[in-house]
Amino acid sequence: MAQNLRVAMIGYGFMGKVHSHAWRSVNHFFPDAPNIEMTVICGRSKEALENARMTFGWKESETDWKKVIARDDIDIVDVCTAGDTHEEIAIAALKAGKHVICEK
């Protein structure tokens, strides 16, 4: 059975849209890669966040990134927020034992 990688994405603006499309395409381009589960998308505005969740195919949404990072069912945290927030989120995710992808 193929391994599953459960992804959380923090941020859903322009780069969040781009990364969402990339996550959906990974297994198409790399069929031998682990299965990608787009588990949770996180942002501040509940309404816009729910729209992004439905539009891009994420299973769940959450407004508190700290809750997302604390979850046991997340393997990768994809940080797509504004640049001045990257450090705090990325370091917290690494300390929680997550793999981190951080948009520059």
Which residue stretches match the model-derived regions?
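N-terminal Rossmann-like dinucleotide-binding module
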Residues: M1-F56
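Beta-loop-alpha module in the N-terminal Rossmann-like domain of NAD(P)-dependent dehydrogenases
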Residues: E47, F56-E103
